[in-house]
Amino acid sequence: MTYNSVSHICLVVPRHPEVSGGSTFVRNLAAAFRNHGLSVRVLSVYPGHPLGGDSFSPAADETDTIFVREELHRRPVSEGRPPWRAAPLALFKRWDRWRQLSALRRTMATLPANSVVIFTHVLGKMMVDESGFQRSPTGPLFVGQHHSSFASLEDEPWLREALPKHFADCDAFVALSDEDAAFFGSLLDVPCVAIPNPAPEGRTLTTQLAKRAVALARFSHEKQIPLMVRLFAAAITVPEANGWSLAIYGDGVERPQVAEEIEHSGMHTRIQLAGVVDDSATALSDASLNLLTSSLEGFGMTILEAACSGIPSIAFDCSEGVRSQLEDGAGYLVPASDETAYVEALRAAMTNDEERARRADRALTRSRSYDASTIAARWLALFDTLFPMDPPAPSEESSTAQARPESTHPCASPGVPSPRREA
């Protein structure tokens, strides 16, 4: 199949590059689109954090930031300042915001007509709307996304209002699993489809010989890293688990709680805060297990990254995205919130090398279904259902007509047109 309808992709993201599952998704998908011959541009709402090594080259040079002065725009200027200092800063903030959003509006207006703008989070679409950009009937497609599960909206209730409001004029919405696509479809009046994350390429298989577990995560409440420390400390109390250690890679607001839990566990010689690593392949290079303890997870990017290196993961059954990667023995899937079962699964993985190796093989085999080229092709196939394959030349009569045909995607309701952009 060939894809002639799209030549340019613009990814609008909250922050990029950085060490996170969402940023990894952007890197992998951008590389896959380029391999299909498309040009890719990344717009980051806030500044990213430069990554070392080859983990983002060459796309780092193609990332533009909307708000360079993040601290100025993320909080009220009156916070912690006397009025005589806040007043002039407020004027500067208004001017700077107008200037940056004007630049964003010009950027959107100059995108080629056969472009697709992918908003990986509603925040990016909110900025485009605030800029005053008006969509043209012949302008690019808009595709929304929420790079987490539908259940995550419970933790951020403002999203329930923001998503339907700002994604109302999108041509489609992409979720990470069929289950989430159905849930988001009940909230959004746009066609909702499921496309999982693409796998990283060029990973080296591990030997499965080291008694070493790893975790790669943002230290936020839904990742439950303090709980991970407690569960690992409980699992290694049996003699059969002698020699096993855990390296936790990442950082975040709960770092003090994680450090305190490690100290409280009495296992600080076997549980280590390993800092931030730019490339997950480095952290996984000598690991035999990958751990997740998330209560909310849209897909679980580290599960896929570990599987590509032949490493099985242990995780709670917190979403279809996680379940689809680990079920049928492709890892260790633990009933949601069942801490006892998690400890038992962890002990079983550490003490049965043959079974762990079998699950590692299944994880590796399943990871191939998320091949980056295959996932990119699914995105391109979606675009082809939204773009007319041979759009007619614009005429005076057709310039006021609808720019897109009725949606032919199976997620669209019969007889219900897909959302249209304002002329």
Q: What are these model-derived regions, one by one?
A:
Residues 276, 295:
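Aromatic "clamp/platform" in nucleotide-sugar-dependent glycosyltransferases that forms part
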Residues 23-28, 211, 218-236, 253-259, ...:
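A conserved mid-protein helix/loop that constitutes part of the nucleotide-sugar donor-binding site
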Residues 12-19, 32, 36-94:
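N-terminal strand-loop element at the rim of the active site
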